[in-house]
């Protein structure tokens, strides 16, 4: 297993924010799979979804994982929320490093994402978004838990507390 922390969880769980601080505290580099895809494809995640669809995006995610699994070491890697959904991807994640599920509750996620219009899966009226988040979490939570080596609940915690919990979990 590589010397990486791999952060998974639903959008708005804090993967990027926690990941950057964790990388800084541990002397590791930070990488974000969505950002890597944007750089490679030369278009935003939103644009990829709009132009080619979710299935195409998920294929790109899998291809990226295949590329980085044995070549990245010394990183904190923030993964797109849907990346662990494919069983094939979960196997790559395990090889990539210690998989940590940052688990936020539904109300926190909705609060954090209410003004974010860069999330292609959360377009629409507020009631529809709430129902969509609820439905997606029902499906994704068990998958995230199965994929994770450890689960860190992020609700009602400061970023520094979450980072400290991850580091303590390693000791």
Predicted feature descriptions by range:
Residues 24-35:
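Post-Walker A helix-loop "phosphate-sensing" segment adjacent to the P-loop in P-loop NTPases
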Residues 10:
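P-loop (Walker A) phosphate-binding loop of NTP-binding proteins
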Residues 2, 21, 25, 139-171:
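NTP-dependent small-molecule kinase module
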Residues 96-141:
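A glycine- and Lys/Arg-enriched "phosphate-lid" helix/loop adjacent to the NTP-binding pocket
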């Amino acid at each position: 297993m590589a010397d990486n922390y791999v952060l998974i969880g639903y959008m708005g769980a804090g993967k990027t924010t926690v990941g950057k601080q964790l990388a800084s505290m541990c002397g590791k580099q930070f990488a974000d799979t969505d950002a890597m895809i944007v750089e490679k494809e030369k278009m935003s995640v939103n644009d990829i979804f709009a132009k080619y669809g979710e299935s195409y995006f998920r294929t790109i995610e899998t291809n990226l994982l295949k590329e980085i699994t044995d070549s990245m070491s010394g990183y904190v890697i923030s993964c797109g929320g849907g990346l662990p959904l494919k069983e094939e991807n979960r196997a790559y994640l395990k090889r990539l490093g210690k998989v940590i599920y940052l688990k936020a509750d539904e109300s926190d996620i909705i609060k954090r994402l209410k003004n974010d219009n860069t999330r292609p899966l959360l377009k629409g009226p507020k009631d529809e978004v709430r129902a969509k988040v609820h439905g997606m979490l029902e499906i994704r939570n068990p998958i995230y838990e199965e994929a994770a080596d450890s689960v860190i609940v992020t609700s009602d915690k400061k970023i520094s507390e979450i980072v400290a919990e991850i580091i303590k979990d390693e000791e």
